[in-house]
């Protein structure tokens, strides 16, 4: 299952192919 949201907080799931995602929160 890939990320469908362009802005996500889940760095463990890769984004869907063709979409550019950015982490809107930094855990580390």
From Swiss-Prot:
Keywords: Amidation, Disulfide bond, Ion channel impairing toxin, Knottin, Neurotoxin, Secreted, Toxin, Voltage-gated sodium channel impairing toxin
Localization per Swiss-Prot or TrEMBL: Secreted
Biotechnological exploitation: When conjugated with a fluorophore, could be used as a tracer in surgery to discriminate nerves from their surrounding tissues, particularly during tumor resections or after traumatic injuries. The dye is conjugated to Lys-4 residue and this synthetic peptide shows only a small decrease in ability to inhibit Nav1.7/SCN9A compared to native peptide.
Record has Disulfide bond as a keyword: yes
Tissue: Expressed by the venom gland.
Disulfide bonds: 2-16, 9-21, 15-25
A GO term, aspect molecular function: sodium channel regulator activity
CC terms in the record's Gene Ontology section: extracellular region
Family, as annotated: Belongs to the neurotoxin 30 (phrixotoxin) family.
Its biological purpose: Potent and selective inhibitor of Nav1.7/SCN9A sodium channels. Inhibits Nav1.7/SCN9A peak current (IC(50)=13 nM). In vivo, does not induce visible signs of toxicity when intravenously injected into mice.
Domain free text: The presence of a 'disulfide through disulfide knot' structurally defines this protein as a knottin.
Designated name of the protein: Mu-theraphotoxin-Hsp1a
Origin species: Homoeomma sp.
